[in-house]
């Protein structure tokens, strides 16, 4: 409680009361006017409201932006942490996004991945939310974090032999050609460039694709 004693009567122009040196975690309350009259007590109430935030996290593929192969940006589990304490968990939707509920602004909020979505490697990065109270002036605030992940990759190796049916001896087939493509694409021509490959077997009957994103080929 703050009181002002022996204040001169305001007359037609009221006094203005403002809060100064408000703690940074609070919204600065609006100024109020206060007329001062003879032998009357004028009362004004100020309420300190904590600044709050929500954060929208958007996950994308580190190389392409959108999901590659049969990998998915949906289903990744992230945690929001206060210091080193896990406060809540959230799961990415089909767009690789989630939005948190409101929390009190502070400088030690972070986002961390707990479980990656299908076809992606776990991201070990600790992402600062950007919820420092000095960044905001109002009660309800929104911030955003973009996070990226690396898709799993692998290759396919083939060894081709022939058997003339008489000797029963398998012979490496030099020059055998194979088209490899992501099954869900439907055909070789429909597959993305990084989701298909052509291999030609060498003199040992061996052929190997380039590294391709997670999926069934």
Which residue ranges define each predicted feature?
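Solvent-exposed loop/turn and edge beta-strand elements of beta-rich ligand-binding domains
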Residues: 1-217
């Amino acid at each position: 409680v703050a009181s002002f004693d022996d204040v001169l009567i305001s007359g037609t122009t009221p006094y203005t009361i403002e809060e100064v040196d408000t703690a940074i975690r609070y919204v600065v309350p609006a100024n109020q006017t206060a007329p001062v009259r003879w032998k009357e007590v004028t009362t004004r109430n100020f309420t300190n409201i904590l600044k709050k935030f929500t954060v929208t996290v958007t996950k994308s593929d580190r190389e392409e932006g959108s999901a590659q192969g049969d990998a998915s940006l949906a289903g990744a589990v992230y945690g929001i942490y206060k210091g080193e304490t896990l406060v809540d968990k959230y799961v990415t939707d089909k767009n690789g996004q989630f939005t948190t509920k409101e929390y009190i602004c502070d400088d030690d909020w972070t986002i961390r991945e707990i479980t990656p979505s299908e076809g992606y490697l776990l991201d070990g990065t600790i992402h600062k939310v950007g919820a420092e109270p000095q960044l905001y002036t109002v009660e309800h605030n929104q911030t955003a974090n973009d996070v990226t992940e690396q898709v799993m990759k692998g290759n396919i190796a083939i060894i081709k032999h022939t058997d003339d049916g008489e000797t029963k001896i398998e012979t490496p087939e030099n020059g055998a050609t194979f088209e490899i493509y992501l099954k869900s694409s439907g055909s070789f021509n429909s597959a993305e460039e990084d989701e298909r490959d052509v291999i030609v077997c060498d003199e040992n009957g061996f052929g190997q694709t380039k590294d391709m994103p997670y999926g069934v080929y």
